Amino acid sequence: MNSYISLIFTLLFFTSAARSSSVSVETGSCVRYTTIYSSGSSEFTSTITPETPSSSSSTFVPISTHTSSATNTTSGQLSISSSSSTSSEYSSSSIPITTVSSSDSFIPSSSQTISASSSTTDNVIVSSSISSTVSSTPVSTIYSGTSGTTFVSSSTTYQVIPTQICDGVRGLEYAVYNYDLPSESTFCHPSNGYTEVSTFNKPAYFGSKDLKQSAPLFTGIFSSLDDIPTYSASDYLPAYPPNPEGMSSTSSSCKTIVYQFFFRVPATDNWSLFVKNVDDAFFGWFGDKAISGWSNVNYDAYAHWRIGAYGMGTFDLGYLEQDSFVPVRFVLANGAYIGGFDFAFNSSSTGPVRTTSYSYTSTCDKSFLPFGKGNGGLDEGTANV
């Protein structure tokens, strides 16, 4: 698009150029995790949701001296540590929680037993990643913490037992390609100075077997701790990880960005996707077809730039259950001059949510295909835009 003319018109008005729709979404789900901390006849139970850190631990202050042991029966990471403390003694009615000052983490071999012992004023901390199964076993190996613990046999054993070992992998993936469709001359190099948006009508090409590029220009994954940078009216690509300097110094003209991720629903409610700053054209797919079978004609969302207005739109995802997964795919293409695209998921109970906090590259039983040729796209027909 012509950046100067667009700026003038955008200051005058900001209107929508979008296809709003109600989308039928196929979803999947993963289990929550219940971890039990026990000592003798008492136990404390907590629930770990996927949005909490992927490991859990609890601190126990023993009466007199004792030995704690645990066995890791899967490939998960096991941690046992000891820290000096003046906390009150452990009683059957409560489990004091204190700060861990030192710890040691390792991956034991199959059926290896690790034990930890402490004096009266020390804490013994037993923790495990949620992909582990940890249970009490006879003591076989002495672990000494940094506080100078001593080994004394005892009948008291503390267990950390994460139930279930199924969860997805956090992250939001993207790939950047050169726009090399036959419509390049009109989409990227318009004779009248304005991108002819309607000539981009084959978005699935960028994930099909027909893709001519052997590899994307850039590719990366947003972690759950990353924010997606604002991308609006820019002459350059957005500063995405892991190479923000390289992307932000590369022209956004004649480029296509493909996004793929599973959106884990934060709360049971009616959900929608809101897009804005679209420059020049955006296509979206939801449900299993976003993984494989996304085509030029079965898209669920579309928005585009036009003279005087960036594309924007709201797309209804329907009523979704908490912790269900929605496969999502976006294709954004920019022709001439500046580009842009921002998006957010929204519900009445949560408002707009931070997308990366609820994004996964795979779930318990589903994953996306690698970027490049055969990324699940079917370059058949043309979009009616």
From Swiss-Prot:
One of its GO terms (cellular component) is external side of cell wall. Pfam families: GLEYA. Its main location: secreted. Glycans are attached at N72, N270, N346. InterPro entries: GLEYA_adhesin_domain (IPR018871), PA14/GLEYA (IPR037524), S_pombe_Mam3/Map4 (IPR051905). Residues 1-20 form the signal peptide. It is found in: Secreted; Cell surface. Gene3D superfamilies: 2.60.120.1560. It comes from the Eukaryota. One of its GO terms (biological process) is flocculation. Residues 41-90 are annotated as: Disordered. Keywords: Glycoprotein, Secreted, Signal. Residues 196-360 form the PA14 domain. May be involved in agglutination during conjugation or other aspects of colony formation. Induces flocculation when overexpressed. This is Putative cell agglutination protein pfl8.
